[in-house]
Design a protein with these regions (language model features):
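Catalytic cores of secreted or luminal carbohydrate-active enzymes
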Residues: 189, 193-230
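A phosphate-binding catalytic loop at a beta-strand-loop-alpha-helix junction
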Residues: 146-168
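PEST-like, low-complexity acidic/proline-rich intrinsically disordered segments
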Residues: 1-17
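Long all-alpha helical scaffold domains
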Residues: 161-168, 175, 179-180, 196-199
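Cysteine-based protein phosphatase catalytic domain of the PTP/DSP
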Residues: 15-151, 172-182, 187-194, 236-419
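Short, hydrophobic/amphipathic alpha-helical patches that form generic packing surfaces
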Residues: 168-172, 205-206
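Glycine-centered flexibility motif
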Residues: 2, 35, 52, 160-163
């Protein structure tokens, strides 16, 4: 009986081998097609090395950014892994380490002699500040261990997440956030648009505020002081100057820390919708809270600044009475701590309009306001509901005085786009 089935089985195996061989030749041919990969890489700079056309750029002499080193069918439009390995071995034999920022895909570290580190976070989003710290310390340690060492950093497309972490390292080395973002944009793209997602740029600014250089810039690594976890209570979400809609849905999430795991998944806390309120409606169930510093005389009759909690009701200017605003007032304030993500949708499930990420430790005066340029991935549908004065406003309850008081000088010196 076995002899009767041997020929069909052999024919099937032979066909499988032939198909795999054909697939390999097809991938090899298409991976050499400059057109396909140039189309996918868009405005990212490419390198032509040893006949290979690769999506990679030197940001500095020791930091290289690139797209994902792919295998199989994905190699048709990403960097083929074997070509990346060949170029790195040729240029930096024994002196390169790969940093993979993808959570969605990985590869066998043995392809790169085991020198692969993983710092995964979600595409088009931000990592926790603790991960940025570990990443910068790891890169610094590797580069300082030998003058020829380089760090090769990639996500999937090799632009947003890669840019955030490259810029974070440049800031760690003493550059300002603005200079780091500008350098990355110039070296990585042809249109000078490097890290284009506002929340990712915001986190580069957050990271800069965690660093100090007591020995001076370029005299050793900086001191890193991450903010203590700061609990804030979200009381109201308001969308100013909306058009063509009577309600917008939202989802609020936090990055959840998991023991012994570097990746922090987003955990949904609540979902609801902002609705249009009637003009003249008194929203006294959700006042604004502010910390006001006023002069108070002590026993020595010398004026001192003392923080006082001030409750201010809604007092929009008259121009806003003619605008449509969408509100959601929390019956019970929503506690938030650390890294927060808020996404807005046209429908309860699906139809994303835009989103924003922020850290609660960097909120000033219990108020966070983001205009259209400060929001992430605003598409055609998102823009269609935003008027010229559109603004997202999040109102929080009193801050934890121990960790998040901002003095008047703090408020004056902090830039709006890093809020």
């Amino acid at each position: 009986m076995g002899a009767k089935f041997s020929k069909p089985s052999q024919a099937k195996d032979s066909a499988k081998v032939e198909n795999l061989s054909l697939q390999h030749h097809l991938i090899n041919y298409l991976s050499k097609s400059f057109y396909i990969r140039n189309l996918v890489s868009k405005q990212r700079r490419r390198m032509l090395v040893a006949g290979y056309d690769l999506d990679m750029s030197y940001i500095t002499d020791h930091v290289l950014a690139m797209s994902f080193p792919a295998e199989r069918m994905r190699a048709m439009y990403r960097n083929p892994l074997w070509q990346v390995k060949s170029v790195l071995d040729m240029r930096h034999q024994g002196h390169y380490k790969i940093y993979n920022l993808c959570i969605e895909e990985s590869y066998d570290p043995s392809h790169f002699h085991g020198r692969v580190e993983s710092f995964p976070f979600d595409d088009n989003h931000v990592p926790p500040l603790q991960m940025i710290k570990l990443f910068c310390e790891n890169v610094s340690s590797w580069l300082s261990s030998h003058p020829k060492n380089i760090a090769v950093i990639h996500c999937m497309a090799g632009k947003g997440r890669t840019g955030l972490m490259v810029c974070a390292y440049l800031v760690y080395c003493g550059m300002s956030p603005e200079d780091a973002l500008q350098l990355y944009a110039q070296r990585r793209t042809t249109n000078n648009e490097g890290v284009s997602i506002p929340s990712q740029r915001r986190y580069v600014g957050y990271w800069a505020k965690c660093l100090s250089f007591p020995k001076g810039v370029y005299n050793g690594p900086p001191e890193v002081k991450l903010p203590e976890p700061c609990r804030r209570e979200l009381q109201r979400i308001r969308l100013y100057d909306t058009v063509n809609t009577e309600s917008i849905f939202f989802v609020v999430s936090e990055l959840q820390e998991i023991p012994s795991q570097l990746y922090r998944p987003s955990m949904e806390l609540t979902r609801n919708r902002c609705r249009q309120f009637k003009k003249g409606y008194e929203r006294n169930d959700s006042p604004r809270y502010f910390l006001s510093f006023v002069e108070a005389k002590n026993k020595g009759n010398e004026p001192e600044l003392e923080p006082h909690l001030v409750v201010q009701m809604d007092t929009e200017c008259s121009a806003l009475y003619h605008k449509t605003c969408l509100d959601y007032n929390f019956e019970k304030p929503l506690p938030l701590t650390g890294d927060v993500r808020i996404i807005f949708y046209a429908k309860m499930f699906g139809g994303r309009l835009f989103y924003a990420c922020f850290n609660t430790a960097f909120i000033k005066n219990s108020l966070l306001q983001l205009r259209l340029p400060d929001l992430d991935k605003v598409g055609k549908k998102g823009r269609s509901i935003c008027g010229p004065s559109f603004c997202l406003e999040l109102v929080f309850g009193p801050a934890n005085a121990k960790h998040s008081f901002f003095t008047p000088s703090d408020d004056e010196n902090a830039s709006d786009d890093m809020s």
